[in-house]
């Protein structure tokens, strides 16, 4: 009896292991097309949100509002940009690593760029939140300085495409509908 049970348990383990391998695939990594579609699906709404927030920020800089109103609105806007960047970063992270040469480096590059953008928006929000609104000239000078710093940090966080030398991914980004 023991031999029969041990044999059955061994067979069950082999069958279970086979099912796990079949269901997860060899590496479990998405194809370049699937990864590109997921990444573009994450970045398209993020870009739209950032564009909208940028326009709103520009309006706040020229609107006839009190410093307190401008501060409240800018803190909210930059907080929204920070959250949108984190949401996009999380979705790119959930996309996994594309099944291509340098897939890990490429995925890490996208995530790292979004992390830096998220952090830049967070720092701008925190800087503006700490500004006093009692003196309008000083407040708006502080806002301008915070936005200049944000722009520099944002530019510095741009993805280094020199590491993205995967022809499969380039083709996938050109072809999948989510990236158009």
PLM region descriptions:
Residues 59-62, 66, 94, 101, ...:
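Heptad-repeat coiled-coil alpha-helices
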Residues 47-50, 54, 85, 89-92, ...:
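A structural signal for well-ordered alpha-helices, especially hydrophobic packing surfaces
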Residues 22-25:
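C-terminal motif of bacterial Sec signal peptides marking the signal peptidase cleavage site
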Residues 123-180:
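A charged, solvent-exposed segment within the mature domains of Sec-exported extracytoplasmic proteins
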Residues 28-79, 175-179:
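Immediate post-signal-peptide N-terminus of mature secreted/exported proteins
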């Amino acid at each position: 009896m023991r031999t029969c049970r041990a044999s059955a348990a061994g067979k069950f383990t082999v069958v279970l292991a086979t099912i796990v391998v079949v269901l997860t695939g060899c590496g479990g990594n998405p194809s370049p097309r699937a990864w590109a579609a997921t990444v573009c699906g994450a970045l398209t709404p993020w870009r739209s949100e950032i564009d909208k927030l940028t326009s709103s920020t520009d309006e706040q800089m020229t609107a006839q509002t009190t410093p307190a109103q401008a501060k409240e609105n800018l803190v909210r806007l930059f907080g929204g940009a920070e959250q949108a960047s984190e949401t996009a970063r999380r979705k790119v992270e959930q996309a996994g690593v594309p099944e291509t040469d340098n897939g890990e480096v490429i995925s890490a590059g996208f995530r790292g760029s979004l992390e830096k953008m998220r952090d830049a928006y967070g720092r701008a929000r925190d800087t503006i939140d700490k500004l006093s609104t009692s003196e309008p000239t000083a407040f708006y000078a502080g806002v301008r300085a915070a936005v200049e710093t944000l722009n520099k940090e944002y530019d510095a966080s741009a993805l280094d495409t020199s590491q993205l030398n995967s022809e499969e991914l380039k083709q996938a980004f050109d072809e999948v509908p989510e990236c158009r």
